[in-house]
Curated annotation (Swiss-Prot):
UniProt keyword annotations, A-Z: Acetylation, Cytoplasm, Disease variant, Exosome, Neurodegeneration, Nucleus, RNA-binding, rRNA processing
Chain's gene name: EXOSC8
Cross-referenced Gene3D superfamilies: GHMP Kinase, N-terminal domain
Originating species: Homo sapiens (Human)
Record-given protein name: Exosome complex component RRP43
GO CC field: chromosome; cytoplasm; cytoplasmic exosome (RNase complex); cytosol; exosome (RNase complex); fibrillar center; intracellular membrane-bounded organelle; nuclear exosome (RNase complex)
SUPFAM superfamilies: Ribonuclease PH domain 2-like, Ribosomal protein S5 domain 2-like
Main subcellular location: cytoplasm
Localization annotation: Cytoplasm; Nucleus; Nucleus, Nucleolus
Function: Non-catalytic component of the RNA exosome complex which has 3'->5' exoribonuclease activity and participates in a multitude of cellular RNA processing and degradation events. In the nucleus, the RNA exosome complex is involved in proper maturation of stable RNA species such as rRNA, snRNA and snoRNA, in the elimination of RNA processing by-products and non-coding 'pervasive' transcripts, such as antisense RNA species and promoter-upstream transcripts (PROMPTs), and of mRNAs with processing defects, thereby limiting or excluding their export to the cytoplasm.
A biological-process GO annotation: U5 snRNA 3'-end processing
Annotated family: Belongs to the RNase PH family.
Length: 276
């Protein structure tokens, strides 16, 4: 009977749970799904990570290549993110050129990289005006069940922390790049941005880490990105119902708490990988 009611009146079905301060999957309104991260998942990439947020699964692979710097920024490299939402992750997506949601997610990740200064572009310079690194960050969703932005941000950060670049010098006689694969170093990750997403129900009720179904039924969504100092790096609100100042402040304080949880989880995984 409950399954039939959910099919016919999905929003009313959800409201009955929300009135009791819980959700159909058993979580409280402010409770996140189980989050896991696996670092170094792709052996052919220069850095990679697999993140699971409940059922939502995103893998990020980073590939480093040489490039010529732009004339207006001769000492800066590039970080190029791309989010792919293929049909295999959900029946809502079609094959072909990137859909609107994938484009929005790619732009969101690009904004996070730029605003948080996670990597100083100058750190990617090999020889000013001649040669820089370009980091291609490909994020692929393997299973879509809502809150793709949180999963992508976490996967990107974890993958970048896994990247090791070889030492590169320019031979003065030949002007060619010489790569020393035996001498590698990790990227200098300057900040640790973490995204926290919320769904708004009936213009007033806030829930964290929405599933795909909850996003579909919500009257609005909001994603806040904070760094370890509690600074706001990014705020993404694609239309929908408005929020009061008090509600927004509540979201930001929850985002600070979530940052600590995610950072702790990632630090533990990285520590467990290091040779004893």
């Amino acid at each position: 009977m409950a399954a039939g009611f959910k099919t016919v009146e999905p929003l009313e079905y959800y409201r009955r749970f929300l009135k009791e301060n819980c959700r159909p999957d058993g979580r409280e309104l402010g409770e996140f799904r189980t989050t896991t991260v696996n670092i170094g998942s792709i052996s052919t990439a220069d850095g990679s990570a697999l993140v699971k947020l409940g059922n939502t699964t995103v893998i990020c692979g980073v590939k480093a290549e040489f490039a010529a710097p732009s004339t207006d920024a001769p000492d800066k490299g590039y970080v190029v993110p791309n989010v792919d939402l293929p049909p295999l992750c959900s029946s809502r997506f079609r094959s072909g050129p990137p859909g609107e949601e994938a484009q929005v997610a790619s732009q969101f990740i690009a904004d996070v990289i730029e605003n948080s200064q996670i990597i100083q572009k100058e750190d990617l310079c090999i020889s000013p005006g001649k040669l820089v690194w370009v980091l291609y960050c490909d994020l692929i969703c393997l299973d879509y069940d809502g809150n793709i932005l949180d999963a992508c941000t976490f996967a990107l950060l974890a993958a970048l922390k896994n990247v090791q670049l070889p030492e590169v010098t320019i031979n003065e006689e030949t002007a060619l790049a010489e790569v020393n694969l035996k001498k590698k170093s990790y990227l200098n990750i300057r900040t640790h941005p973490v995204a926290t997403s919320f769904a708004v129900f009936d213009d007033t009720l806030l829930i964290v880490d929405p599933t795909g179904e909850e996003e579909h039924l919500a009257t609005g969504t909001l994603t806040i990105v904070m760094d370890e100092e509690g600074k706001l790096c990014c705020l993404h609100k694609p239309g929908g119902s408005g929020l009061t100042g008090a509600k927004l402040q509540d979201c930001m304080s929850r985002a600070v708490t979530r940052h600590k949880e995610v950072k702790k989880l990632m630090d533990e995984v990285i520590k467990s990988m290091k040779p004893k």
